[in-house]
Amino acid sequence: MNSKKVNWIFLSLILLNMLMYVLMLVCYVQGILLFEMNILVNLLLAQLVMMLPAILFALAFRRKTETGHLNEMLGFHKIRVSSFFMIFLFTYLIMPLTTALNAISMLFVENEVTAISGDVLQMPFPVMLFMIGMFGPFCEEFVFRGVIFRGYKNSGPVFWSIFWSALLFGLMHLNFNQAAYAVAIGILFGLLVEATGSLWSSVIAHMIFNSHQVCLMYLSDLFQADLAAAEEALTQEMLIAAIGPYLIIAAVATPLAVCVLVWLAKNERREAEFCSIWACRKMKKEAMVSIPLIIAIVISLAYMSLEWILALL
């Protein structure tokens, strides 16, 4: 697997998403309902569409030197128990940064998570905790920190492999709100994988992050808080006032998260690999950007822009 194959994977992923949206729209207009569409079906279809091209490409274009099982090829290595608990700390330390980025994006676009909260809350808590908090994160990490990141890593410096896999992770969400903080999460999770040497670390962190959001959503509902109505009541001035404190907290918490990454690298005996991320950033192997990647990025940004413009009308 290399960058060229990875770029085709992402283009396939985006095109499949577009095809799914068109088919669903046609079925809705024509009154054709093969099954009841709800948030659960939407989430399941989205993950399957994302996983399909990644699995097919990973199996079909596995390098001759990669003779092990797929889980070994993608970096599903064991981590120490102490590292497992420090990943919890790392995940909560990066939350102020993601919250601040989310709030900044809300100055311009709608909060996508809040927008679907009503649909989510109609489902049983255990079902949504599994789908959003466990299944979704596993699929996304398998694709972006597994197949895509490692494909780029075979072609270029780790520094740029982390950047490109994070950028594509953000674009995959196909909306500016989630993309704003998904890119930051992607970079931090990429660093986490390099610090521990295991894809399980980012899977665990992603599960903690999403599960935390799901729990907050249901707790708010338990206390009769209407998230959608609360967001509509937010003014620009209120958002700007909230961003400041979050940025201050993030300015303290994010460096601490980096310290945790350094500790994890030492704990997993990967100090040399982790330190080389920045040192080897100018090393060149193969071109990481190709025509399929450019096409995929243009399609993603065009869709996101169109959705944003339509929301303003």
Features from the language model and the residues they span:
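Hydrophobic residues within alpha-helical transmembrane segments
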Residues: L15, L45, F135, W164-L168, ...
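Alpha-helical transmembrane segments in multi-pass membrane proteins
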Residues: N17-R62, P245-T254, L313
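Juxtamembrane helix-loop-helix connectors linking adjacent transmembrane helices
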Residues: L33-L43, L70-C139, N154, A302-L313
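Small-polar-interrupted transmembrane alpha-helices in polytopic inner-membrane proteins
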Residues: P157-N177, G186, M207
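C-terminal membrane module of polytopic membrane proteins
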Residues: S211-L313
